[in-house]
């Protein structure tokens, strides 16, 4: 595990920060961006070995690409649980619900019994993949996050034996 931020993580953070670079951003979305970027600086990174055999909590059919606003709201609500204070959670929701679907990032949700219980961002470049911002059941413990990340990697056919690096962002 490393504190060094891989270039792909910088690309993801820049992409997210630019989501509120609009003509009339709300003060709440700008405050949410500031909170998000502060937390992003504290993250650690590890390479993700897709050859690891572990029990997955998510079948491929339970993982969905976020591609319309209602799913974005669900994604944002789950992500906001990474912050402790309710007022910070509200700012994060305001920030993340501004996301416009575009490369190089895609948002994913994991469902259980019809309820959203996991979320992550997948960033893709020519030479790397990053699975980040992983939250499972309002928690970010490494074991559950790794399982969800591996489930996403499996769904997207990302594997560590390819010529691309596969990174996982980990909350310390």
Set out the residue ranges of the language-model regions.
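Acyl-donor-binding surface of acyltransferase catalytic domains
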Residues: 1-60, 165-172
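Acyl-donor binding region in acyl/amide transferases
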Residues: 2-6, 10, 81-88, 93-97, ...
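Short amphipathic alpha-helix that is part of the acyltransferase structural core
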Residues: 44, 48-95
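Short, Lys/Arg-enriched charge-dense amphipathic segments
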Residues: 49-56, 111, 128-137
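Short, functional N-terminal and low-complexity linear motifs
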Residues: 60-63, 117-121
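Short loop/turn motifs at secondary-structure junctions and domain boundaries
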Residues: 98-103
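Conserved beta-hairpin
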Residues: 104-119
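A short acidic/small-residue loop/turn micro-motif
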Residues: 122-126
């Amino acid at each position: 595990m490393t504190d060094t931020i891989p270039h792909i993580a910088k690309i993801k953070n820049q992409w997210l920060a630019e989501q509120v670079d609009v003509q009339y951003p709300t003060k709440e979305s700008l405050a949410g961006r500031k909170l998000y970027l502060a937390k992003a600086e504290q993250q650690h990174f590890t390479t993700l070995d897709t050859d690891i055999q572990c029990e997955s909590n998510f079948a491929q059919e339970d993982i969905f690409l976020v591609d319309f606003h209602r799913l974005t709201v669900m994604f944002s609500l789950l992500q906001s649980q990474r912050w402790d204070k309710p007022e910070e959670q509200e700012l994060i929701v305001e920030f993340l619900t501004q996301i416009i679907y575009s490369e190089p990032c895609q948002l994913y949700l994991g469902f259980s019994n019809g309820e959203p219980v996991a979320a992550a961002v997948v960033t893709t470049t020519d030479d790397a993949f990053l699975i980040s911002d992983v939250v499972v059941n309002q928690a970010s413990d490494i074991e559950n996050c790794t399982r969800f990340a591996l489930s996403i990697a499996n769904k997207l056919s990302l594997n560590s034996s390819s010529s691309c690096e596969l990174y996982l962002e980990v909350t310390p």
